[in-house]
Amino acid sequence: MNTSGSGIAQAHETDALDLSTMTKHEMPYGIDAIAEIRMSTPADYPAIIRMGEAADMGTLDGFEDTLVATHPSGGIAAFCRLRIYDGIAHVNPIVVDESLRGHGVGAALMKAARERYGELRFVARGYAVGFYKFIGCTPVEWSEIAPEVASDCDDCEKRDECQPLPMKYPIENEERAITPSLD
């Protein structure tokens, strides 16, 4: 991982996470649902936009710092768009194809984002809080989330239904992250 003076990793299109080098114990369960995790390219943008709209994220733009997980048969299985505010990476948003949810794709994508960018901050939709806690994320105060990200919730008509929770995915939870109990 290359880092800049700001402490944020500099991701490059050629830096794909090689899943073939990981043992089954290093990977989340069901990780065979994806071929690689890499930086997005302009060819990926239409699929990212469609997935974002299908996940009720509105129309997204600005994909310079977006990771994608590709499906073995081609196409985008998931994406994680990051925004850097005050030197901190904010996930905004992460979307996994509905048919692949529950197979470790989101966990692998979050781990790859954390490896590239360091600690991650984000706002979790209420129904996803259990997943984020499972991979090692912890709740934080709203003041720890960039106003540019938090305002998405402030202006959302579904806020009461969604029950958003500000969270972070810290570096110090590396041992616990995405490694399910093998008991």
Named regions from a protein language model:
Residues G102-E115:
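Conserved acetyl-CoA-binding loop-helix of GNAT-fold acetyltransferases
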Residues G126-D152:
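Conserved active-site alpha-helix within GNAT-family acetyltransferase domains
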Residues I145-D183:
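C-terminal "cap" of GNAT-fold acetyltransferases
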Residues D65-A78:
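Conserved beta-hairpin
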Residues I94-R101, Y127:
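A short, internal acetyl-CoA/4′-phosphopantetheine-binding micro-motif in the GNAT/acyltransferase core
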Residues E115-Y127:
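Conserved GNAT acetyl-CoA-binding A-motif
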Residues I8-D15, E36-A47:
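A short beta-loop-alpha structural element at the N-terminal edge
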Residues G75-R83, I88-V95:
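Conserved beta-strand in the GNAT
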